[in-house]
């Protein structure tokens, strides 16, 4: 019985004396080289083992990492809460850089809790950490970095340093690469010198001091360490840890090597390496292509440079010729007198960024309008490109455009100048930021104008048209008054624009026009019959515009049910006959508006759109009616159908002046001629 108890007690004592960790351990190991396949060495990433026994952590792959681990865990603590035991390691390293003075980041020796660094990044992170875990205490990593790039974000001192790092790429302490000799003199070393260097890393569990020492390969270990720091590693190390090397590349081609390695825990120093067995630095030289560039490129360059010069000259000449053709303009002697009003096509091309569709403001039967910014003055402009297939009357047309450009009125869009190129004419206007009036009237507009704004636009256009007819030095017949040619400035003031069809004549005379031009729905019947444009034909178009603004409808609309054209003038006239003319008002106005002003505008619109030009008021009279300086004749629908005297004579119409709204618009014609 006593013997059995003694046996059990003895077996229990043996169990207690065994390590708690059942994993295999290695208290020391030595690799004088790494012959394939190396025992207990795991390589990851782009790391390889060369045929001559060198651990090659990286190749010439950019932005990559390479790792090498000792596969067995090393027990650094007797228990999880115990202190870290003393350990010592020595290894031989070397770095090759494709450019002798610049490297693609460095390498490191590390002790980590796991045999893989899955989240580690390349470049400045050295394959140790990432942008998300750098500096975290949960990393539990001790590293000795051999860095060849200065990264200010990690407080690096230079681009050739050794540092002791704990859980971070910011070194606890670092030093310029070198060693102290026997006479205590510091000697510099260069990591990318393509030479082997031996490193010793020692930790003393009594003093908690970490020493890193370096020397050229073949030299004895210096007595004085290169970098020393006192740090208790108990909170950094777990009970079992893994050893290894890491390296990373950037955009500069570089390779990192480990030639030999020994390690010991719970001992004074690591086993010494047998230096004669440590592999030599690999012969890394230029490739055949690099040798070609070095030896043959000078001769090749002598032959290539003249060829490149000739080819470049040909392309340059072609570029200049094409550029000149691209910006070529037509210029005749008679245009000399208009020189200051003529703008360069090149400036307009760059102002509109090549007349791209994204800067297209609108298009119509007479051209397309683009927004632009003049390169030098930064002035915003609108450029209208008008087809000019016929050269007949071109000189007179340009002369009129230049004359119109001299006009100045707050309700006219300033015409800044013109440009003539090939078969087109370009007219340049001030840019109006709020666009044309039509987009605020039709098709459920996103932004609607209240009556006060609309009435202000009407007054503005009437003022501008009165200036054209009576106040300027010559009479200007606009010939294309419509909602899309009324532009709104930043304060929503109405400005009459687009003088591409305008004609000039002296006061007291009529312009000699023989062609009908204008836009459907705005042409007066007398203009269609005779081809003559007068101030009265402008008044007719203005009358249609008045009805558009008040009703929010187009001059001509198609009925969905009957597929027939419905004339706005006929529709408003029908409401007037029924005695409820205000029912023609735009529903978007709501119920808050000046009914007297709206009724005046509607009746004045019908009066201006009368089929007899003699009955239509002048723009002077129109302004007086709108401003309240004169009273609109007391009109009724019967006055437009019955007998009476002419407007201005007892405010009646003659029997011969019948209101024929259908004929006034139904035969409107669009023509590109003059």
Curated annotation (Swiss-Prot):
Signal peptide extent: 1-22
Alphabetized CDD domains for the sequence: lectin_legume_LecRK_Arcelin_ConA, STKc_IRAK
UniProt-recorded Gene Ontology molecular function terms: ATP binding; carbohydrate binding; protein serine kinase activity; protein serine/threonine kinase activity
EC number: 2.7.11.1
Keyword ATP-binding attached: yes
Active site: 480 (proton acceptor)
Membrane topology of this protein: Single-pass type I membrane protein
Glycosylation sites per record: 21, 28, 40, 81, 136, 188
Region described as Legume-lectin like: 26-263
Domain Protein kinase: 355-632
Domain of life assignment: Eukaryota
Protein name: L-type lectin-domain containing receptor kinase IV.3
Organism: Arabidopsis thaliana
Lineage of producing organism: Eukaryota, Viridiplantae, Streptophyta, Embryophyta, Tracheophyta
Gene: LECRK43
């Amino acid at each position: 019985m006593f013997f059995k108890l003694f046996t059990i007690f003895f077996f229990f004592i043996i169990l207690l004396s065994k390590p708690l960790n059942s994993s295999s351990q290695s208290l020391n190991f030595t690799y004088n080289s790494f012959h394939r396949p190396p025992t207990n060495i795991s390589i990851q990433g782009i790391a390889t083992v060369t045929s001559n026994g060198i651990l090659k952590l990286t190749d010439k792959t950019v932005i990559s990492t390479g790792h090498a681990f000792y596969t067995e865990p090393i027990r650094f603590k007797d228990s999880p809460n115990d202190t870290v035991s003393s350990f010592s390691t020595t290894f031989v390293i070397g770095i090759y850089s494709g450019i002798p003075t610049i490297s693609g980041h460095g390498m490191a020796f590390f002790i980590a809790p796991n045999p893989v660094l899955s989240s580690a990044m390349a470049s400045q992170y050295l394959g140790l950490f990432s942008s998300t875990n750098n500096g975290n205490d949960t990393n539990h990593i001790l590293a000795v970095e051999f860095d060849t790039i200065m990264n200010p974000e990690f407080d690096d001192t230079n681009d050739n340093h050794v540092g002791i790092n704990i859980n971070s790429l910011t070194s606890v302490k670092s030093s310029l690469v070198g060693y102290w000799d026997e006479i205590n003199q510091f000697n510099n070393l260069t990591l990318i010198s393509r030479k082997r260097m031996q490193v010793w890393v020692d930790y003393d569990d009594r003093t908690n001091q970490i020493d890193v020492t370096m020397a050229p390969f073949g030299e004895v270990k210096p007595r004085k360490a290169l970098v020393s720091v006192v740090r208790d590693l108990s909170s950094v190390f777990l009970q079992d840890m893994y050893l290894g090397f890491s390296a990373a590349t950037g955009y500069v081609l570089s390779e990192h090597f480990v030639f030999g390695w020994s390690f010991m825990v719970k001992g004074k120093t690591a086993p010494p390496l047998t230096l004669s067995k440590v592999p030599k630095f690999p012969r890394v030289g230029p490739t055949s292509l690099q040798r070609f560039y070095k030896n043959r490129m000078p001769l090749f360059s002598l032959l290539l440079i003249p060829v490149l010069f000739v080819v470049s000259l040909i392309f340059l000449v072609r570029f200049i010729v094409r550029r000149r053709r691209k910006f070529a303009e037509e210029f005749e002697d008679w245009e000399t007198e208009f020189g200051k009003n003529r703008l360069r096509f090149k400036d307009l091309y760059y102002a509109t960024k090549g007349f791209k569709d994204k800067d297209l403001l609108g298009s119509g039967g007479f051209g397309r309008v683009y927004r632009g910014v003049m390169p030098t003055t930064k002035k915003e402009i609108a450029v209208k490109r008008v087809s000019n297939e016929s050269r007949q009357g071109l000189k007179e047309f340009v002369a009129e455009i230049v004359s119109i450009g001299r006009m100045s009125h707050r309700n006219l869009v300033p015409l800044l100048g013109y440009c003539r190129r090939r078969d087109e004419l370009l007219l340049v206007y001030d840019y109006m930021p709020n666009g044309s009036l039509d987009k605020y009237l039709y098709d459920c507009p996103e932004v609607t104008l209240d009556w006060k704004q609309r009435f202000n636009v009407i007054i503005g256009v009437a003022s501008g048209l009165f200036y054209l007819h009576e106040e300027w030095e010559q009479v200007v017949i606009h010939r294309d008054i419509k909602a899309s040619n009324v532009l709104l400035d930043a304060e929503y003031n109405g400005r009459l624009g687009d003088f591409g069809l305008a004609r000039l004549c002296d006061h007291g005379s009529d312009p000699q026009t023989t062609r009908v031009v204008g836009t459907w729905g705005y042409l007066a019947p007398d203009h269609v019959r005779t081809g003559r444009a007068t101030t009265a034909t402008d008044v007719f178009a203005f009358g249609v515009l008045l009805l558009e603004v008040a009703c929010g409808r187009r001059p001509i609309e198609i009925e969905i049910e009957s597929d027939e054209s419905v004339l706005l003038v006929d529709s408003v006239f029908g409401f007037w006959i029924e005695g409820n003319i205000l029912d023609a008002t735009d529903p978007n106005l709501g119920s808050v508006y000046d009914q007297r002003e709206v009724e005046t505008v509607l009746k004045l619109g019908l009066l201006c759109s009368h089929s007899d030009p003699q009955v239509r008021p002048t723009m002077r009279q129109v302004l007086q009616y709108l401003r309240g300086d004169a009273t609109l004749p007391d009109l009724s629908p019967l006055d437009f159908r019955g007998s009476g005297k002419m407007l201005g004579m007892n405010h009646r119409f003659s029997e011969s002046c019948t209101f024929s709204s259908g004929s006034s618009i139904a035969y409107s014609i669009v023509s590109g001629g003059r």
